[in-house]
Each structure stands twice: as C-alpha cells, then as structure tokens.
C-alpha cells in the first residue's frame, strides 16, 4: 500500500467526523408512525404533524397554547404554583427527585399550563397538559391550576378549553391526587350551571383519572386524529379479559364511531373549528361571514347546549 492510500482514508474519516460535529444536536426527529426522518424546524412549522404521513406527534403544552391563542394579550394563570412532597413519597426514587428531574427536562413547574387570551379576538381561557412532565399526571398543583382557570372563565363568562394529554392521577401524591378528580369535576359543574361553554380536546394519550374526570366532561368533546383515549390501557384490558381487542380500539376514530367523542379535528384546523364552535355557543358573529366553516359537530349538540343555557 502506497503512502497516499494510507493518508486518504484517514483524511476522509477526519472530514466525516468534522461534518458530524458541525451538525447541531436535536435537529432531526423520527416519525413514530412512518419512521420518516424529519427536519425539526420544518416539523415545528407543521405544528408537529408529520408532513409525510399526517401523523400527529405530541406537542408540548406551552407550544400548543402559544399556537392556539392569539399572540397579543396572553396571560398565564397561577404560574407560581409549585408541587410539594407532603407525603415524603419514595418508590424507586424520591418524589422530590422526580419533580426536580421533570422540572429540569421540561422547564415547567408542573404538568399543566393555564392561560387567558383570545382566539381570533374571542376571549377564552385555555389549559394544556404537559405529557413530558411525569406523563402529564394530575396532582394537587394540576388540579388547583385547572380550578383557577375554570373559576376565571366562569367569573368572566368566557369559554374554557382544555387540551388533555395524561396518564392519569399521580400515584406519588396518593389521595391528594385522587381528590383532584372530584375537585375539577365540581369546578366544571359550576361552569355548567352558569352556562359557560367547556370544550375538552383529547390528544394522544389520555388515560386514568384524567379521562375519568375533567377530560370527558366537555359540553363538546373533541379529539385529535388517532389519539389513544381510555381509562385502562389496551394491554391491561387484554390481560384482564383475556381476549384480543378490536383493531383501533381506544383510538379517537373508534370512539367517534361509538359516540364517545363528538368530533375529530385535525391540528391544523383546530383554531378555526373551535373558534367557530365557541362563537356559536356564545352567540358571537363569525369573523368571516362569507366563508361558512365546515363543522362536523352535530347541530343538535350545539342546540342542546344553547337550550340548556336558557
């Protein structure tokens, strides 16, 4: 082998290594559905919807609310609330250590963000679960933030919208967590008594105590495409009943077919569609009178709520 043959492969390896070093980390993400490798800035422009197969990837709570609400006038609700390890709980790790790790990973205090703002000029209060924070589990802070958001919506007479993404109640808070199911449900009952609309948007995934309480109590329940929604997971159910579940069981399309949700809305259409529904429920004129929105919510559902309001 000549001296040139010895040098050239070494130079090629060095150049390849330099190129790899010049590419920043976190620029690419693989679609869990079609496995296409996606350029992250492009994916974010598509609101985390795969441009190849239209799969809805999970979206952080803050990005979701910043995208959903108008840019001007957003105001966070109860941003200063911090979780407390009252029980000194420990499983394989201390609860306080899990909280610290989740806060560092997500840069959020807990698994729910609440904001007051506008949707195409219509005042609204919106909350969103952060699934990356301990699986979006509901503890005392999540419940308190939700109740404060519902209270503000009731006092101001503006619609409340919830984007749910949760594994359920937070086991590290035991009964303090389970109490939030009743607490949030009671807040929504007060909202209903005042005739204030509550729209629940079910995103992937929604399970456990969250699905058994606030997530399924919407005046209109909306789901994103192919979202996994239920109480217990499909594997748990199969092991319990010892039967094979139907294809697509617990997916939003299956739930729509069986009447559990009222409509499925693509993420790109969410602002327009929910804005249209809320304007109907609050008897507000549409922004664009010439373009009638394509609502798939049954008119009877909207009429029932309007009649209950009177």
Curated annotation (Swiss-Prot):
Broad enzyme group: transferase
Cofactor(s) needed: Zn(2+)
Binding site residues for Zn(2+): 31, 34, 50, 53
SUPFAM superfamilies the record matches: ClpP/crotonase
Transmembrane segments: none
Entry's localization field: Cytoplasm
Residue numbers spanned by region Disordered: 282-310
Domain (CoA carboxyltransferase N-terminal): residue spans on this chain: 27-296
Pathway membership: Lipid metabolism; malonyl-CoA biosynthesis; malonyl-CoA from acetyl-CoA: step 1/1
Coiled-coil region list: none
Domain of life of the organism encoding this protein: Bacteria
GO molecular function, one term: zinc ion binding
Keyword check for ATP-binding: yes
InterPro entries linked to this entry: AcCoA_carboxyl_beta, Acetyl_CoA_COase_Trfase_b_su, ClpP/crotonase-like_dom_sf, COA_CT_N, Znf-ACC
Reactions that this protein is recorded to catalyse: N(6)-carboxybiotinyl-L-lysyl-[protein] + acetyl-CoA = N(6)-biotinyl-L-lysyl-[protein] + malonyl-CoA
Zinc finger feature spans (C4-type): 31-53
Principal subcellular localization: cytoplasm
Keywords (A to Z) from UniProt: ATP-binding, Cytoplasm, Fatty acid biosynthesis, Fatty acid metabolism, Lipid biosynthesis, Lipid metabolism, Metal-binding, Nucleotide-binding, Transferase, Zinc, Zinc-finger
Complex and partners: Acetyl-CoA carboxylase is a heterohexamer composed of biotin carboxyl carrier protein (AccB), biotin carboxylase (AccC) and two subunits each of ACCase subunit alpha (AccA) and ACCase subunit beta (AccD).
Recorded family membership: Belongs to the AccD/PCCB family.
Protein's recorded name: Acetyl-coenzyme A carboxylase carboxyl transferase subunit beta
Gene: accD
């Amino acid at each position: 082998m000549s001296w040139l043959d010895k040098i050239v492969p070494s130079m090629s390896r060095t150049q390849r290594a330099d190129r790899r070093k010049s590419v920043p980390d976190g620029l690419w993400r693989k679609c869990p559905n079609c496995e296409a490798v996606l350029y992250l800035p492009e994916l974010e422009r598509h609101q985390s919807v795969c441009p190849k197969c239209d799969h809805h990837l999970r979206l952080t709570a803050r990005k979701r609310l910043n995208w959903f609400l108008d840019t001007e006038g957003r105001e966070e609700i109860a941003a200063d609330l911090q979780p407390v390890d009252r029980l000194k709980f420990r499983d394989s790790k201390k609860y306080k250590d899990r909280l610290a790790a989740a806060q560092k990973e997500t840069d959020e205090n807990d698994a729910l963000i609440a904001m007051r703002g506008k949707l195409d000029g219509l005042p609204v209060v919106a909350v969103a679960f952060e699934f990356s924070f301990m699986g979006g589990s509901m503890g005392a802070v999540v419940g308190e933030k939700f109740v404060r958001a519902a209270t503000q919506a009731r006092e101001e007479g503006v619609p409340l919208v919830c984007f749910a993404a949760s594994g359920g109640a937070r086991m590290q808070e035991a009964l303090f967590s389970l109490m939030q199911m009743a607490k949030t449900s009671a807040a929504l009952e007060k909202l209903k008594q005042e005739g204030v609309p509550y729209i629940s948007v079910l995103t992937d995934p929604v399970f456990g105590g969250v699905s058994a309480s606030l997530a399924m109590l919407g005046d209109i329940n909306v789901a994103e495409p192919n979202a996994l929604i239920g109480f217990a997971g499909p594997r748990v159910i199969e092991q319990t009943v010892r039967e094979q579940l139907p294809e697509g069981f617990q997916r939003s399309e299956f739930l729509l077919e069986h009447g559990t949700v009222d409509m499925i809305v693509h993420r790109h259409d969410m602002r327009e569609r929910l804005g249209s529904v809320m304007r109907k429920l609050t008897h507000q004129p549409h922004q664009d009178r010439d373009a009638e929105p394509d609502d798939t919510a049954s008119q009877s559902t909207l009429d029932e709520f309007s009649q209950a309001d009177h």
